[in-house]
């Protein structure tokens, strides 16, 4: 894998690889965040088991009226034919009139490597076109290979647990995070919350990282434990996949 990872100052790339492969935990919750204003993040999707309404297991982002971007590992062990995609949600246990529910007609992967947590992105084609408006809207994509500088402020969000032993929240949570470049890889955007234990964790994989109003990351994994203060949180870098995404979207047009 030489050449695949940048070498952060003072960190050998093979040490970073060992940490990622040996200590990665796929992300699923927002630790230390707060409740989002209802329906203020209209691009956020909830992936649920069709037989169990409200059974959120991963997040996603609407990037086109017929497509949701999520993490590839979300459907590694679950058939996409058993999944319902919910848009326009805030309270997952409430029958909100804003909610729109879809099945999946097709999935598109891009060389996902689960051993090294690379290319952790997956496109879900919905069975019909979403009705766009105030509560359901499409997120903006970055330019191909667009980068984020150290210190960029972003927003992570999801319905994952509020702590390791805490229950799963009913309502959407969000957290202000800061982009960091140490202990990161070119395939990822990495973030920390300075000076406090907060971040992503078990249960909200696939959810968005929004920076300057643009979708820059897909919630992917953490190293060793959640909100450790030692390692950043890892998101799949959306800007690496924009050309691939656009090719999929063009190919799906009638």
Curated annotation (Swiss-Prot):
Q: Which CDD domains match?
A: Tryp_SPc
Show the SMART domains listed in the entry: Tryp_SPc (SM00020)
SUPFAM superfamilies recorded for this chain? Trypsin-like serine proteases
Q: Which InterPro entries match?
A: Peptidase_S1_Elastase_sf, Peptidase_S1_PA, Peptidase_S1_PA_chymotrypsin, Peptidase_S1A, Trypsin_dom, TRYPSIN_HIS, TRYPSIN_SER
Q: Taking every annotated instance into account, which residue ranges of this chain make up the domain Peptidase S1?
A: 30-250
Cite the record's note on assembly. May form dimers. Interacts with CD177; the interaction tethers PRTN3 to the cell surface; the interaction is direct. Interacts with SERPINB1. Interacts with ADGRG3.
EC number(s)? 3.4.21.76
Q: Which taxonomic lineage is given here?
A: Eukaryota, Metazoa, Chordata, Craniata, Vertebrata
**Glycosylation (residues):** 127, 176
Membrane topology per the entry is: Peripheral membrane protein
Identify the species of origin.
Mus musculus (Mouse)
| Keyword Protease appears in the UniProt entry | yes
Q: Say what the protein does.
A: Serine protease that degrades elastin, fibronectin, laminin, vitronectin, and collagen types I, III, and IV (in vitro). By cleaving and activating receptor F2RL1/PAR-2, enhances endothelial cell barrier function and thus vascular integrity during neutrophil transendothelial migration. May play a role in neutrophil transendothelial migration, probably when associated with CD177. Triggers inflammatory processes in neutrophils by interacting with ADGRG3 upstream of F2RL1/PAR2 activation.
Q: Which residues form the active site?
A: 73, 120, 205
The UniProt catalytic activity note for this protein reads: Hydrolysis of proteins, including elastin, by preferential cleavage: -Ala-|-Xaa- > -Val-|-Xaa-
Instruction: Tell me which PANTHER family the record gives.
Output: CHYMOTRYPSIN-LIKE ELASTASE FAMILY MEMBER (PTHR24257), MYELOBLASTIN (PTHR24257:SF15)
List keywords of the entry alphabetically: Cell membrane, Collagen degradation, Disulfide bond, Glycoprotein, Hydrolase, Lysosome, Membrane, Protease, Secreted, Serine protease, Signal, Zymogen
Subcellular location per UniProt equals: Lysosome; Secreted; Cell membrane; Membrane raft
Protein name per its UniProtKB record: Myeloblastin
Family per record: Belongs to the peptidase S1 family. Elastase subfamily.
A GO BP entry is: collagen catabolic process
Q: List the disulfide bonds.
A: 58-74, 154-211, 184-190, 201-226
Task: Look up the signal peptide feature and give its range.
Answer: 1-27
């Amino acid at each position: 894998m030489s050449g695949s990872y940048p070498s952060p100052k003072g960190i050998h790339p093979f040490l970073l690889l060992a940490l990622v492969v040996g200590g990665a935990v796929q992300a699923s919750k927002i630790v230390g965040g707060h409740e989002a204003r209802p329906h203020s993040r209209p691009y956020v999707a909830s992936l649920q088991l069709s037989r169990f309404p409200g059974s959120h297991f991963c997040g996603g982002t609407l990037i086109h009226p017929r497509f949701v971007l999520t993490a590839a590992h979300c459907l590694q062990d679950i058939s996409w034919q058993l999944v319902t995609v919910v848009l326009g949600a805030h309270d997952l246990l409430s029958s909100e009139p804003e909610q729109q529910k879809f099945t999946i007609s097709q999935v598109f992967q891009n060389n996902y490597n689960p051993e090294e947590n690379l290319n952790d992105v997956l496109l879900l084609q919905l069975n019909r076109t979403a009705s766009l408006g105030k509560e359901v809207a499409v997120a903006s994509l970055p330019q191909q290979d667009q980068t984020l500088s150290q210190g960029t402020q972003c927003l992570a969000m999801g319905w994952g647990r509020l702590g390791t032993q805490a229950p799963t929240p009913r309502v959407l949570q969000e957290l202000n995070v800061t982009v960091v470049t140490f202990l990161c890889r070119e395939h990822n955007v990495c973030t920390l919350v300075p000076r406090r234990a907060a971040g992503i964790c078990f249960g909200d994989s696939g959810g968005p990282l929004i920076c300057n109003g643009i979708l820059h990351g897909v919630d992917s994994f953490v190293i060793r434990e959640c909100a450790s203060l030692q390692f950043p949180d890892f998101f799949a870098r959306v800007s690496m996949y924009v050309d691939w995404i656009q090719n999929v979207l063009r190919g799906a047009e009638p």
